[in-house]
């Protein structure tokens, strides 16, 4: 049987491949950015993923979301992406959370799943800020992705709360 990561292994050392295999990435928001990110991360050989989204597909998603198809209309985005990820890598450890994450749930989800990295691809500002605050306090690396019509932005690195907006309440 051919090693499906053979081409990836040409790019990375054994140590780097082991780091990927042992890493856990949590992606919240599986629409225009999150659906592509989830698939690309799975194809890189990540060992464990937690994918979170409470939304279901509707026809208007088809122009911009990887897993939005006629056959997936009305189905939860995390469930659909999970099937696709498992088709790519049947050995991946995959946690599926079918939930719109309220700000007060962010801390619980981080404690429950304990990811090494978080990719925030949600649209709502208040939960987005809570993910940023929680990850900063827990020293979890976070990347923030956001789209709005005709533009997209991905922010990584040392993001400060003041880079976004002022937060009305800080918890924990």
Describe every region a protein language model picked out.
Residues 1-172:
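Adenine nucleotide-associated cytosolic modules
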């Amino acid at each position: 049987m051919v090693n499906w990561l053979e081409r990836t292994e040409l790019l990375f050392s054994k140590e780097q491949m082991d780091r990927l295999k042992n890493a856990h990435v949590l992606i919240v928001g599986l629409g225009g950015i999150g659906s592509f990110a989830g698939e690309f991360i799975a194809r890189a050989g990540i060992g464990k993923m937690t994918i979170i989204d409470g939304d279901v597909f509707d026809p208007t998603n088809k122009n911009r979301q990887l897993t939005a198809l006629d056959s997936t209309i009305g189905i939860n985005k995390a469930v659909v992406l999970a099937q696709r990820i498992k088709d790519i890598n049947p050995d991946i450890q995959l946690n599926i959370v079918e939930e719109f994450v309220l700000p007060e749930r962010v801390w619980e989800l981080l404690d429950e799943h304990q990811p090494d990295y978080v990719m925030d691809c949600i649209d709502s500002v208040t939960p987005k800020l809570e993910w940023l605050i929680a990850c900063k306090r827990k020293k979890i690396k976070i990347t923030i992705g956001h789209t709005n019509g005709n533009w997209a932005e991905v922010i990584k690195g040392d993001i400060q709360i003041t880079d976004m907006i002022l937060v009305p309440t800080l918890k924990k």
